[in-house]
């Protein structure tokens, strides 16, 4: 019997990109496919999103993987390069680089490149992670402008730290800082991630950087409902994680279920054992009561998540059988709900799917 399965709907992926483009017709789409395509498969996602204007990845290894399979679209590496060998590969494979520190500027000055490089200057407007400060950025921009190793115009970008917060004060400050510092700079601009895409239409500039929304998942989780209807109406979940019932047991009242005896049967009742666990990427900290979907109805998780199995309450599903499919998240059960129950975010759940899960592509 197959173990857990992640079904990837490539039609939904293409649909989501088309919706993004329709909602921001004046912007180019830089599709974020880092971290193995947010757990959906780097190459699979890139091939499905051939209509994206460019791809964003975290590191050079991801970019080279795409080039090796024949992806010819522009690719921008968010962390840039860190030595001369990497910089040479950027030029050889036509990779765009985000420039976020003085060491990278120095490398550009001293390295002889076979061809000029497309770069984006990262301006730190408040994320306080990577990038040049607002005060440093004009001088760095002027340095880059004089480099013969760099294609012109230079891209200008920032990253929003709090765009998914209903309190807009800090994000509006970041956007104001970015527009102010780049006012006299010439070059394409990029500000918004998925949350910013919905919440800050004034920041939909030359390039947008959709990430989690490409995969049909709200960047706001389940708590921020301002865009809930729009997201549910226009976007479709791409991944459905499912596993099969491998055993059905009738338990007595007060029988405990699973490690630690944390959950006991309130009455005589049937339970099902499902072939998925934290060894597959299902969150160990999902508590009893976390929903799963069985034959179109919600059933609650009971007891602790094991490495290879979970148990679910079958009292609402007396006709369930061994071999039935159980949906852990995806079509009909948003992953945002599971993330909330487990005290995490949907991004983490998607990225933690392990290698023993079988991936299947569908077009639906």
From Swiss-Prot:
InterPro entries: Ala_racemase, Ala_racemase/Decarboxylase_C, Ala_racemase_C, Ala_racemase_N, PLP-binding_barrel
Residues modified as N6-(pyridoxal phosphate)lysine: 34
Active site (UniProt): 34, 259
Pathway the protein takes part in: Amino-acid biosynthesis; D-alanine biosynthesis; D-alanine from L-alanine: step 1/1
Binding sites annotated in the UniProt record for substrate: 129, 307
SUPFAM superfamilies, A to Z: Alanine racemase C-terminal domain-like (SSF50621), PLP-binding barrel (SSF51419)
Catalytic reactions on record: L-alanine = D-alanine
One Gene Ontology term, aspect cellular component: cytosol
SMART domains xrefs: Ala_racemase_C
UniProt GO MF annotations: alanine racemase activity; pyridoxal phosphate binding
Keywords of the record: Isomerase, Pyridoxal phosphate
EC number: 5.1.1.1
BP terms from Gene Ontology: D-alanine biosynthetic process
Cofactors (names): pyridoxal 5'-phosphate
Top EC class for this record: isomerase
NCBIfam families, A to Z: alr
Family, as annotated: Belongs to the alanine racemase family.
Purpose of the protein: Catalyzes the interconversion of L-alanine and D-alanine. May also act on other amino acids.
Name of the protein: Alanine racemase
Source organism: Coxiella burnetii (strain CbuG_Q212)
Lineage, top ranks: Bacteria, Pseudomonadati, Pseudomonadota, Gammaproteobacteria, Legionellales
